[in-house]
């Protein structure tokens, strides 16, 4: 018994439909590839960059709020009236929302640490012919860490009245703290501020959090009559931003005093010794601990009567209670 086997019949319409489907898939995959590999990285890079610039401005607003409270306290003291504390708040954006489906958000971490970035000021002065020693300190920082995936990862921090911007290849102070040097008749008039932050908290995400501040203590002291061998010490220990402080303070002193000296630099150390002739006027140094990644910055200003002496040292103190969102442990007074 013979069985009939029919030949397969060619159908040009079926071939065209298959080819069309494949081409449509290729176009879709190409378009999807362009979005994932080109559009999303550019979009996220711009978003993360814009976020860092906005956060820098927000930290500047936070500093401005504290500075205004200190000015109000000074005005109240000068007028002999009681300063009523006020609480100010500044909104800070933590991170960046991603592109739905194609990219996840970039979270940031905002941390308030009352023990970070300690500053110490020490010197001797004369009162009624007796030598007295002064030693003051302050600490505390608010830091935003943005582990950007497309833009350069950065940190923005506020410590002792300064706003810093930090990344792996550099750091600098963007908003200056209170530190000034005046030169008159071969004598130096120096002003500096110590600002302590109280409270402890940390929050992570892409939300916008309120950072509140309340100045609860403020005072200003003026010192004069320094011993002929007096040294004014300003030390900044265990800070990620010690190199920024080194450059800022050295530049401030150099712009006013206009002295030559000796500059040395290694992979872990940077130092400048300013001299007037053979006499050392100031010595500033920044040293990196490679284990912790933290700097120690030391500044010593020497009293050299008749050459470049110390006439006045004005030291301002401020204590500020800070709150970060709802995650802050308050300090009771």
Task: Kindly give the residue locations of the regions a language model identified.
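Intrinsically disordered, low-complexity regions enriched in Pro/Ser/Thr/Gly and acidic residues
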Residues: 112-314, 329-333
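N-terminal single-pass transmembrane signal-anchor helix
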Residues: 11-38
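N-terminal leader/signal peptides at the extreme start of proteins
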Residues: 1-13
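Extended hydrophobic/Leu-rich segments
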Residues: 4, 21-24, 123, 257
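Beta-strand/loop motifs with alternating small/hydrophobic and polar/acidic residues, enriched
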Residues: 18, 34-172
């Amino acid at each position: 018994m013979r069985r009939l086997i029919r030949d397969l019949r060619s159908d040009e319409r079926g071939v065209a439909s298959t080819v069309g489907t494949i081409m449509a898939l290729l176009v879709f995959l190409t378009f999807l590839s362009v979005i994932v590999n080109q559009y999303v990285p550019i979009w996220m890079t711009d978003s993360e960059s814009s976020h860092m610039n906005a956060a820098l401005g927000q930290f500047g607003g936070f500093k401005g709020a504290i500075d205004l409270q200190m000015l109000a306290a000074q005005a109240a003291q000068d007028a002999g009236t009681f300063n009523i504390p006020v609480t100010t708040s500044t909104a800070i954006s933590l991170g960046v929302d991603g592109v739905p489906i194609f990219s996840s958000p970039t979270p940031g971490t905002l941390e308030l640490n009352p023990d970070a970035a300690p500053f110490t000021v020490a010197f001797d002065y004369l009162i009624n012919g007796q030598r007295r020693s002064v030693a003051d300190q302050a600490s505390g920082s608010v830091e935003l860490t943005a582990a950007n995936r497309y833009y350069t990862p950065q940190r923005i921090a506020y410590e002792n009245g300064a706003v810093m911007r930090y990344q792996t290849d550099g750091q600098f102070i963007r908003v200056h703290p209170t530190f000034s040097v005046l030169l008159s008749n071969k004598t130096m008039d120096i002003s500096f501020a110590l600002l302590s932050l109280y409270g402890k908290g940390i929050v992570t995400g892409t939300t916008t959090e309120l950072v509140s501040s309340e100045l609860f203590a403020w005072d200003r002291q003026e010192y004069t009559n320094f011993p002929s061998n007096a040294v004014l010490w300003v030390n900044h220990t265990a800070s990620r931003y010690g190199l920024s402080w080194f450059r800022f303070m050295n530049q401030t002193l150099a712009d006013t005093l206009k002295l030559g000296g000796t500059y040395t630099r290694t992979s872990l150390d940077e130092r400048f010794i300013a001299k007037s002739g053979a006499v050392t006027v100031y010595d500033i140094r920044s040293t990196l601990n490679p284990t912790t990644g933290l700097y120690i910055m030391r500044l010593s200003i020497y009293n050299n009567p008749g050459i470049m002496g110390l006439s006045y040292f004005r030291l301002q103190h401020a204590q500020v209670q800070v709150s970060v969102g709802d995650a802050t442990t308050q300090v009771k007074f």
